[in-house]
Regions:
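Catalytic core of the metallo-beta-lactamase
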Residues: 17-71
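Metallo-beta-lactamase
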Residues: 1-40, 85-103
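Cap/insert and terminal regions of metallo-dependent hydrolase folds
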Residues: 49-126
Length: 126
């Protein structure tokens, strides 16, 4: 999200701008050039929202964050009440469903039941 749009939505730049180099990206972005960590556009909840696909030896994991709060969000397409763009969020859910169908494990942003089923830090995700 560009700084002006962020400010319009109540984000305070001082909360996030720590002086680091920032690169705005459009579309997918391979962080290391080896497909091990890829930013995926999953717009809808907020403009510019991104999820991460992480390639592990055991298969791909997608950190969906706020693109998909709960497992039931993906299964039932039940969107939260506060959504920036409903159609974009539904398209992002379709993308996550395709990744899951291809074998990726989706990590849901706020699903307490899901988080009980995965290793907790500092244990590795395998």
């Amino acid at each position: 999200m560009d700084p002006e749009s962020a400010a319009e939505r109540g984000f305070n730049r001082a909360d996030f701008d720590l002086g680091h180099k920032v690169v705005q990206i459009d579309g997918e972005h391979d962080l290391f050039g080896d497909a091990s960590v890829v930013c995926l556009p999953t717009h809808g909840h907020t403009p510019g929202h991104q999820s991460l696909r992480v390639r592990l030896a055991s298969g791909d994991v997608v950190l969906a964050a706020d693109a998909c709060y709960f497992c039931r969000t993906l299964r039932e397409r039940r969107l939260p009440q506060r959504v920036y763009d409903r159609q974009a969020m539904l398209a992002s859910l379709d993308k996550l469903a395709r990744l899951e169908a291809a074998g990726a494990r989706i990590f849901f942003g706020h699903d307490g039941e899901f988080w009980k089923s995965v290793p907790q830090a500092p244990a590795p995700i395998t």
